[in-house]
């Protein structure tokens, strides 16, 4: 069972909530917008299923980009960047948060092989 969270701008349904990834289904009413905010360590992506969603992005105090997303469009906002969204019309979207993992996050003590080469 999903918990629907009411927002001033619409609703959000958390589908997956884990330490390094979150997935939310959001519905934003026409004219609705979220707070201007940033995430310290989360990267934020928006995928519009239906509707039109503006993604506003700032660098310091300067608005540097407004991207309009339509059905099947995606926008990614890096961690630490102020942003907000606003719906031009009723919009259904997926919002994904994740944190970067190191691709080289492995320390090998023994290299893999066949069992006759190494006695476990």
Predicted regions and their residues:
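Double-stranded beta-helix
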Residues: 3-6, 86-120
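Catalytic phosphate/metal-binding cores of nucleic-acid and nucleotide-processing enzymes, i.e., regions
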Residues: 21-23, 80-84, 88
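A generic "binding-loop/recognition-motif" signal
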Residues: 32, 41-42, 81, 89-90, ...
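A short, N-terminal "cap"/entry segment at the start of jelly-roll beta-barrel domains
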Residues: 1-25, 30-36, 66-71, 111-120
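Short acidic-glycine-tyrosine-enriched beta hairpin
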Residues: 59-80
């Amino acid at each position: 069972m999903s918990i629907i969270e009411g927002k001033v701008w619409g609703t959000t349904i958390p589908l997956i909530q884990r330490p390094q990834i979150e997935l939310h289904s959001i519905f934003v009413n026409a004219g609705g917008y979220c707070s201007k905010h940033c995430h310290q360590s989360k990267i934020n992506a928006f995928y519009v299923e239906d509707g039109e969603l503006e993604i506003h992005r700032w660098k310091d105090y300067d608005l540097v980009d407004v991207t309009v997303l339509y059905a099947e469009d995606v926008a990614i906002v890096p961690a630490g960047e102020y942003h907000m969204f606003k719906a031009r019309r009723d919009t259904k979207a997926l919002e994904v948060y994740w944190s970067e993992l190191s691709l080289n996050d492995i320390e090998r003590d023994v290299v893999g092989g066949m069992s006759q080469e190494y006695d476990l």
